[in-house]
UniProtKB/Swiss-Prot annotation:
Keyword Acetylation: yes
Gene Ontology terms, MF aspect: identical protein binding; structural constituent of eye lens
Annotated PANTHER family: BETA-CRYSTALLIN A4, BETA/GAMMA CRYSTALLIN
Gene it is expressed from: Cryba4
Family assignment from sequence similarity: Belongs to the beta/gamma-crystallin family.
Residues with the N-acetylthreonine modification: T2
UniProt-annotated stretches for the region N-terminal arm: 2-11
Function recorded in the entry: Crystallins are the dominant structural components of the vertebrate eye lens.
Protein name, per record: Beta-crystallin A4
Keyword field: Acetylation, Eye lens protein, Repeat
Domain of life the protein comes from: Eukaryota
Free-text comment on this protein's domains from its UniProt entry: Has a two-domain beta-structure, folded into four very similar Greek key motifs.
Organism: Rattus norvegicus (Rat)
Species classification: Eukaryota, Metazoa, Chordata, Craniata, Vertebrata
Length: 196
């Protein structure tokens, strides 16, 4: 069973700038933004998350690489993408992560796509799935019972990030194609809960 999250208006705030170091033009968001281009920005190069958790995307329309943005300052691309294998130096669209709940998050991982094969139940952060006993470097599918999670391609939360939420796809992610437009492999080796 997937638990539905409660969305509250005004719970999210992020301020973005078009230059690194919190310089240049700025804009504040309290809701999703499919394209900063519509606001006259070419890109976002620094930001401050004031409340809530957000996911930033490399391209407009919530496409491309995903970056989890939790409360704090991001003075440049290396602050949000320094752990990834292929960092994007800009962000072009944003949306809040509605179901982030660090204390009550549950995720089931499956060995194969379509919820087949061996499975594991998670309710904590795992910097290495192999260290917790998961065989191999791949996860075929996910079912998010509650909360929001970020899965990473490599141990230590490095590599491509995939945001999984209980209120998207009814919490069911049957194949890597549902993890995001940039997903091209089943390789997932670390998983953590997203914090509000």
């Amino acid at each position: 069973m997937t638990l539905q999250c409660t969305k509250s208006a005004g719970h999210w705030r992020v301020v973005v700038w078009d230059e690194e170091g919190f310089q240049g033009r700025r804009h504040e968001f309290t809701a999703e933004c499919p394209s900063v281009l519509d606001l006259g920005f070419e890109t976002v190069r620094s930001l401050k998350v004031l409340s809530g958790a957000w996911v930033g995307f490399e391209h407009a329309g919530f496409q491309g690489q995903q970056y989890v943005l939790e409360r704090g300052d991001y003075p440049g691309w290396d602050a949000w993408g320094g752990n990834t294998a292929y960092p994007a130096e800009r962000l072009t669209s944003f949306r809040p992560v509605a179901c982030a709940n660090h204390r009550d998050s549950r995720l089931t991982i499956f060995e194969q796509e379509n919820f087949l094969g061996r499975k594991g139940e998670l309710s904590d952060d795992y910097p290495s799935l192999q260290a917790m006993g998961w065989d191999g470097t791949e996860v075929g599918s996910f079912h998010v019972q509650s909360g929001a999670w970020v899965c990473s391609q490599f141990p230590g939360y490095r590599g491509f990030q995939y945001v999984l939420e209980s209120d998207h796809h009814s919490g069911d992610y049957k194949h890597f194609r549902e993890w995001g437009s940039h997903a091209h492999t089943f390789q997932v080796q670390s998983v953590r809960r997203i914090q509000q």
